[in-house]
């Protein structure tokens, strides 16, 4: 027994030394960022230099200006509202060619943890770059003509603007109910979260259910590493079926960033990427939920070692990561069956019926057909168990 305990201790020590703990493994610490390190843009014109964070009012105005300036390329969707009534917005961007039916849908979503605002800034700048480059950059024009890109720069506005709409200095991880939104999704492998499903997450689930996203990423901060499924298991316990694909995608992302700054993405693993559960096992996370239930491949991008970068460093992070962020969108065209968006497709132990139904749906089992009448049910997403496999039905 003594030898076993010693061996366990030595193994635990080696593992702990091999990689940095996940930033959300520890309790929150008091605010340490000096207000002098953060400059806020109080007008649209001040934001044009891209060396500031926007106030909440400027953020909303920026999203509207994208639509006003490029109405033929984008429109604004309201995903929902936060606990305190702030809008959760998504900008849908696509080109003007005629093959709209066959464009796969891509999704970027940032700042689920309100104090991790690097992605917030990067997503706003990405929106601006995609729109301004259409028609002048052959690469971007081709991408938009073949892809529908939805970008949600800020998914936890109450956490980001906890100190008031004028500043991000006192941003916090949680929403206004002090719930960690990345521990609040239904867990396909475990139990439901302790807290009720929060308005921000309910809105996000409904929004994703109305789309056919094939590839997505949610953006975080506090470390620099590409975190791919599963979060609920170590790679020893259960490999994601796309494990090797994820490794190659992550490697391409990291390698692209290191062409600009070779020191990036080294504070967790030397490779710059890791299976989420190998870093730190969590339950009720967004990544596993969307991968399992929504026929989409989503990863977690930890983009900066500092959760809230000083504004003097923002431009460097954009220069380092912008090409990688764009190239990740292009990965959607390397997926199998990209042209069959909206068609029934197998995913692990689940089949997905994404086409809306207003009444009954018939699902083919191995030995029989099963009819489910949803006519008296409210609109929403239904996860049904048919002969031991999960089936998703979306009702409008």
Model-derived features: where do they sit?
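Positively charged n-region of N-terminal signal peptides that target proteins for export
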Residues: 1-4, 395-396
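Active-site/substrate-binding loop(s) of hydrolase catalytic cores
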Residues: 100-112, 116-244, 248, 259, ...
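C-terminal outer-membrane/trafficking sorting elements
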Residues: 344-396
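Active-site-adjacent mobile loop/cap segments within catalytic or ligand-binding domains
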Residues: 216, 221-239, 274-336
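Boundary at the C-terminal end of the N-terminal hydrophobic targeting segment
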Residues: 16-18
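Sec-dependent N-terminal signal peptides
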Residues: 4-13
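Soluble metallo-hydrolase cores and metallopeptidase-like ectodomains found primarily
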Residues: 54-106
């Amino acid at each position: 027994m003594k030898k076993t305990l010693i061996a366990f201790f030595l193994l635990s020590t080696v593992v702990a030394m091999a990689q940095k703990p996940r930033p959300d493994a520890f309790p929150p610490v008091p605010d340490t960022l000096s207000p002098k390190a953060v400059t806020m843009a109080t007008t649209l014109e001040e934001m044009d230099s891209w060396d500031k964070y926007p106030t909440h009012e400027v953020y909303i105005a920026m999203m509207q200006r994208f639509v006003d300036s490029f109405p033929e390329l984008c429109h604004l969707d309201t995903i929902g509202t936060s606990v305190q009534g702030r809008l959760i917005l998504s900008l849908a961007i696509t080109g003007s060619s005629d093959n709209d039916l066959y464009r796969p849908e891509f999704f970027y979503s940032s700042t689920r943890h309100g104090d991790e605002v690097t992605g917030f800034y990067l997503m706003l700048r990405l929106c601006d770059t995609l729109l301004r480059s259409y028609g002048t950059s052959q690469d971007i024009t081709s991408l938009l003509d073949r892809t529908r890109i939805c970008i949600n720069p800020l998914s936890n506005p109450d956490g980001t603007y906890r100190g008031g709409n004028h500043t991000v200095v006192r941003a916090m991880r949680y929403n206004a109910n002090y719930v960690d939104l990345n521990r609040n999704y239904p867990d396909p492998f475990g139990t439901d979260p302790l807290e009720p499903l929060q308005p921000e997450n309910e809105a996000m689930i409904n929004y994703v259910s109305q789309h056919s996203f094939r590839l997505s990423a949610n953006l975080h901060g506090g470390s620099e590493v590409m975190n791919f499924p599963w979060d609920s298991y170590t790679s020893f316990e259960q490999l994601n079926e796309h494990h090797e694909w994820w490794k190659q995608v992550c490697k391409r992302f990291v390698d692209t960033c290191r062409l600009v700054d070779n020191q990036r993405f080294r504070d967790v693993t030397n490779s710059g990427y890791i299976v989420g559960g190998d870093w730190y096992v969590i339950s009720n996370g967004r990544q596993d939920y969307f991968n399992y239930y929504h026929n989409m491949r989503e990863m977690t991008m930890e983009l900066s070692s500092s959760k809230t970068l000083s504004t003097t460093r923002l431009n460097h992070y954009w220069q380092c990561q912008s090409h990688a962020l764009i190239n990740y969108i292009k990965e959607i065209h390397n997926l199998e069956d990209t042209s069959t968006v909206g068609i029934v497709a197998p995913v692990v132990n689940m089949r997905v019926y994404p086409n809306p139904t207003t009444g009954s749906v018939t699902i083919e089992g191995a030995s029989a057909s099963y009819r489910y009448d949803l006519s008296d049910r409210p609109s929403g997403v239904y996860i049904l168990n048919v002969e031991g496999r999960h089936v998703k039905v979306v009702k409008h």
